[in-house]
């Protein structure tokens, strides 16, 4: 009998538990360790921040689902991983031994790397539903006395899509309130160009996003490095290819900036397991090279940047890409418990819907990291409605405890979008 422990119950961790339950033997055990028993659909946080959703709209209690599936569910944070002893230490003083471990912790948010940055400083965040609720309260106060808005992503950030989404959603929300004419907006990003997205673009994301910003009268600064944030003022350096800098002092009445990520403390600083930023190192099978009974999925996985840029830019880990990591990991652990070697490799394909409040952009990147077999993007009102439908669908899937319904698998196969590279062999 094997015991598999999953650290985290977000997008990667919850679906990981469901897929393991399908791939393991009946005698094997699964334990999920998480700080929060409630799953929050993070892609809807921009809507929460303008009052178009509430916490209850985007949440699912995982406890009854895990119980029904026979998955042990520990709602206590992990404090330290001891891989040499196959043990996870928990905040309540207890510990869990494991045969196999899946790190699905998500990231730690590095607000502290910039003075005055983040919810405890002078900028808002939409990384967590708690942040989104605080951002909404601040937005309501802002609307009583409108002024300039600054939105974007800081140096080292890897998740740029939600920053663009939130800029456009704010634009739509302000127009609905008929105060958009009183709000100058600036988009500030560490990307070397608009639409880079940490991926050197997907299809014509550069043209599509530049056009969307222009048509909404949103100015932008690229290759931006934030030096500090004060109350009502953001200090930014625009960095040229040769290293020359141009300073900007941007006044704001409301600011939302996405931070850089790093690995959580419980799995950081472990030789052979994590890189200097605390992200977990994996091979093509999602397996850690130093500790072969440890796997990792999601934002916590170490992926090198696309290349050298004037300001550091990370690579995003998008939803479908994470699901492909999960599927490969579940199959590979299933093989190991049966005495076989892992042979499945995730495709890391990306299928993304970016909502603009009334329109949106969709893109498919196969694989997410270039060079690609498919490199497509499109814009239209249909994307806004597709994002709403996907929110409802995914939350239902989480509540039911289903990793991939048959009709989802069939639809993706029809579109030629696979989670496993092995699925295309032969």
Regions found by a protein language model. Name each.
Residues 2-72, 155-199, 414:
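Beta1-alpha1 glycine-rich phosphate/pyrophosphate-binding loop at the start
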Residues 29, 68-84, 88, 96, ...:
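A Rossmann-like FAD-binding core segment of flavoenzymes
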Residues 68-165, 169-178, 245, 256:
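FAD-binding core/adjacent interface of flavoenzyme oxidoreductases
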Residues 110, 118-145, 251-254, 258-324:
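FAD-site-proximal beta/loop scaffold in flavoenzymes
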Residues 320-347:
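Internal hydrophobic alpha-helix adjacent to the cofactor/substrate pocket in enzyme cavities
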Residues 345-364:
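Flavin (FAD/FMN) cofactor-binding core of flavoprotein oxidoreductases
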Residues 363-426:
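C-terminal auxiliary extensions adjacent to catalytic cores
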